[in-house]
Amino acid sequence: MPRKAKEYPEEGEFVIATVKSIHPYGAFLKLDEYPGKEGFMHISEVASTWVKNIRDYVKEGQKVVAKVIRVDPNKGHIDLSLKRVNQQQRKAKLQEYKRAQKAENLLKMAAEKLGKDFEMAWQEVWVPLEEEYGEVYAAFEDAAQNGIEVLKGIIPEEWLEPLNEIVQNYVEVPTVTIDAEFEITVPKPNGIEIIKEALIRARDRVNEDKDIEVKFTYQGAPRYRIDITAPDYYKAEEVLEDIAEEILRVIKQAGGEATLLRKEKRIKKIKRRGA
C-alpha cells in the first residue's frame, strides 16, 4: 500500500482513509497513506445536511476520500471532513492514489532486479523522488519521456539501469492532441498538387521530432484537417503555429488563399514500447 514520505498530512490535503470505528458523535479513520496515523471526523463534518444517524453515511471498513482540516503533531490529532470533498476532488485523489499504486509496483520490480527489499527501495528511491516531484509516478513519466538521466543526482546510480528498463516498457506518457482545419484554395490547373506539396512540406518540417506527430486528412474541398500530437499543449500549439505559417506562405506564393480554423484540444496517453 503506497505511503507518503512525510510523517503527517498537511491541512487542506486530501487523503485516502478507512473507517475504523463509528460513534454517535463521529468516526475514527485510519489514514492509509500514513501508517500508524488516525484521524477523527466529527458528525458535523460527515455531510452538508443534518445527520441523524452517522451510519447512514459511513460504515466500518469503508474507504473514503477525506479532507484534512486540522493537524496537531504535538498531540497527534488529525481532524477530517467528508462534506468538504466534492466529486472532482474525490476523483482526482483516487486517480493520484492509483498512480501511486502503479509506481509502487514498478519500484518493487526494480528492487527485485537489484536484490533489494522494498523498504530499502522506499528509502533510496521513493522518498527522494516524492520530495523532488511531488509524486513518484510523475518522476517515472519524466524518465520515460525525457530519459533516465533526469533522475541522476536524485537517486543512487545503481537504480538508474533497472528503472530505465521498467519505465520505458510500462509507463504511460500523457500526450496532448490538438486538431484544426485549413480552408485552402489555389485557383490554378495544378492547384491540388500545390496544396498537397504545401501540406507535405509542412508535415515533414516537424515530423523529424520523434515526440511530435502530425497527420493531415482530406475533409472535402476546400477543407483539410490537421491532428498534432505532442508532449504538452504548449508544444502542440507551437507546432501548429509553425505549420500554419509554412502553409500560408506557400499557398500565398502560389496565388491561393488559406485560412486556419481552430478546434478543441484532446488529451490521450501513449504506452511506451513493450507495454
UniProtKB/Swiss-Prot annotation:
- Spell out the molecular function terms from Gene Ontology: ribosome binding; RNA binding; translation initiation factor activity
The record's section on InterPro entries has: NA-bd_OB-fold (IPR012340), S1_domain (IPR003029), S1_IF2_alpha (IPR044126), TIF2_asu_arc (IPR022964), TIF2_asu_C (IPR024055), TIF2_asu_middle_sf (IPR024054), TIF_2_asu (IPR011488)
Alphabetized UniProt keyword annotations: Initiation factor, Protein biosynthesis, RNA-binding
Q: Does the keyword Amino-acid biosynthesis apply?
A: no
Query: What CDD domains does this protein's entry cite?
Result: S1_IF2_alpha
Q: Does the keyword Repressor apply?
A: no
Instruction: Extract the Pfam families matched here.
Output: EIF_2_alpha, S1
For this protein, the record's PROSITE patterns field holds:
S1 (PS50126)
- Record domain S1 motif: where: 12-83
Q: Which domain of life is it from?
A: Archaea
Protein task: eIF-2 functions in the early steps of protein synthesis by forming a ternary complex with GTP and initiator tRNA.
Please give the HAMAP family that the UniProt record associates with this protein: eIF_2_alpha (MF_00231)
The subunit field of the Swiss-Prot or TrEMBL record says: Heterotrimer composed of an alpha, a beta and a gamma chain.
Concerning PANTHER family, the annotation shows:
EUKARYOTIC TRANSLATION INITIATION FACTOR 2 SUBUNIT 1
The record's similarity note reads: Belongs to the eIF-2-alpha family.
What the entry lists under NCBIfam families is as follows: PRK03987.1-1, PRK03987.1-4, PRK03987.1-6
Designated name of the protein: Translation initiation factor 2 subunit alpha
Query: What is the organism of origin for this protein?
Result: Thermococcus onnurineus (strain NA1)
**Its gene?**
eif2a
